[in-house]
């Protein structure tokens, strides 16, 4: 599988600029690209409690519709973050958009300090079957909690995709976390982070990465903007799970109702 990691700078509360950059990155993908991944809340940047009502959009709004049109035109899938407005309730949301539409929606379940008072926490984990691979989404701070990735693994995830908005001085924390989450769940993990300055003096740390099911870093970006092409060989899943399978051997499983949808989406509801 050919994947493009779009490690971009963004502008907080400037949807038009961020969308333009996303559409340009999608248009520039090589013809054999199957998936492009952007950072956390890339489309809107990070709103504040005072601005979120003006900045956030529904998932069927004009900004997501423009991304859907680009995905159809290029015949590829897009994972991208947004500030979601669901009838006046606001979420830090990541979407998996295919040429057919929105295949998966995930709302951040672990809110970082600056998320609180702006967004509500999501209430479930979810995976979907895309391109023959079961995919799960996480957002930034989620990966510092092993249970988040394990929830996706219990739902069958073979590929963990993390949209990231991690800032200095916490870059090394997420490097360690993404390696651990891949290794302990014997799954591929992709993480795409923002770079350069944001509001309130934040400096985003970059370090987008691809990690294999053994926890080995196959690719790691620096701190500069860039679009990076990587390739995933899912035959490595079988090799990683040949001698032992953590999910089979674990003694304690995460609680919560599992919901299977006709679309292939599989959800674990947080009790």
Where do the PLM segments sit?
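Cys-nucleophile CN-hydrolase/nitrilase-fold catalytic domain and related Cys-dependent amidase chemistry
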Residues: 15, 23-99, 105, 167-187
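C-terminal beta-strand edge segments of enzyme domains
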Residues: 127-129, 194-271
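Conserved beta-strand and immediately adjacent loop positions that scaffold enzyme active sites
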Residues: 79, 93, 124, 207-208
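Active-site catalytic loop in hydrolytic enzyme cores
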Residues: 85-158, 167-176, 180, 239, ...
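Short polar catalytic/cofactor-binding loops
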Residues: 7-13
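Extreme N-terminal starter segment of soluble prokaryotic enzymes
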Residues: 1-5
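CN hydrolase (nitrilase-like) catalytic-core segments centered on the catalytic cysteine
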Residues: 62-77, 144-228
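Short hydrophobic-aromatic micro-motifs
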Residues: 36-37, 134-139, 161-162, 190
């Amino acid at each position: 599988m050919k994947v493009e990691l779009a490690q971009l700078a963004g502008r907080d509360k400037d949807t038009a600029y961020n969308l333009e950059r996303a559409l340009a990155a999608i248009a520039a993908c090589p013809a054999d690209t199957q998936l492009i991944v952007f950072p956390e809340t890339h489309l809107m940047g990070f709103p504040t409690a005072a601005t979120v009502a003006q900045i956030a959009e529904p998932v069927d709004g004009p900004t997501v519709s423009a991304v859907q049109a680009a995905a159809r035109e290029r015949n590829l899938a897009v994972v991208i973050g947004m500030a979601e407005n669901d009838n006046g309730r606001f979420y830090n949301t990541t979407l998996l958009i295919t040429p057919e539409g929105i295949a998966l929606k995930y709302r951040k379940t672990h809110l970082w300090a600056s998320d609180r008072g702006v967004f509500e926490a999501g209430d479930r984990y979810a995976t979907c079957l895309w391109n023959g691979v079961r995919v799960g989404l996480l957002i930034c701070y989620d990966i510092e909690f092993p249970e988040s990735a394990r929830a996706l693994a219990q739902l069958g995830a073979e590929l963990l995709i993390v949209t990231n908005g991690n800032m200095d001085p916490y870059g090394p924390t997420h490097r360690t976390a993404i390696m651990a989450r891949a290794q302990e769940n014997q799954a591929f993990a992709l993480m795409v982070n923002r770079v350069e300055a944001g509001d309130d003096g934040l400096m985003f740390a970059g370090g987008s990465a691809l990690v294999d099911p053994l926890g080995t870093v196959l690719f790691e970006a620096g701190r500069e903007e860039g679009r990076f092409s990587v390739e995933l060989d899912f035959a490595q899943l079988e090799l990683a799970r040949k001698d032992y399978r953590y999910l089979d051997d674990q003694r304690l499983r995460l609680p919560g109702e599992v919901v299977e949808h006709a679309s292939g989406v599989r959800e674990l509801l947080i009790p």
